[in-house]
Amino acid sequence: MTFAIPDDLAPEVYPLAWLLGRWRGPGFLAYPDIPERPVVVETEFTHDGGPYLAYASTTWLLDGELAGLDRPFDPEALAAGQLWAAESGYWRPVVGGPRRSAFGVVQEGSDTRTEPGGAEPDPAGRRAPSTEVEVLLAEPSGHVSVFVGSVRGPRIDLATDLVARTSTAAEVTAATRMYGLVQGDLMWATDLAAFGHEMQSYSSGRLARMA
């Protein structure tokens, strides 16, 4: 599906413009005490002209079998079963000022970045420019999370800076997320530290652009 940047999109949001639209596709989730199961995810990014994107995502258990994420699929044909999770919030690129990221630090007025694992930036500049992004998410399960990270070309890496929960919500202490645009599809993966377990893979999937 052809995508064009809206004329009224705020320039600050251009690094995230490729997320705009409605996405739907299959995935898998598994965690200690949660057997692996297929899911269907529907995600939408919208804008109102402000320097941010509005976001909403819903996950259902898939009513049917899923052979794998590398097979062709019809997003409309994926049958949603029991509701599993929902979340909504805002994605905001950080423009100007000191940059802070869960994956490294850039001092104000400097292009020197400490990369994940302590690696220095590519001196030849082969990597795409990086923009810091802040994400605020709320879930009806009783959790509110603040993610920080960066968008570099068609890839986004995020990690929680804060996870708050109500007194009745399950224990979730941290999470990381990766999003990438691959051959027109939105690939995603989530690692989670929850219920007393260390950070580990929780879910992943592949979404096709619907609109």
Curated annotation (Swiss-Prot):
Pfam families: THAP4_heme-bd (PF08768). This is Ferric nitrobindin-like protein. HAMAP family: nitrobindin. Coiled coil: none annotated. A motif (GXWXGXG) lies at residues 21-27. Residues 104-130 are annotated as: Disordered. It comes from the Bacteria. Gene3D superfamilies: 2.40.128.20. Belongs to the nitrobindin family.
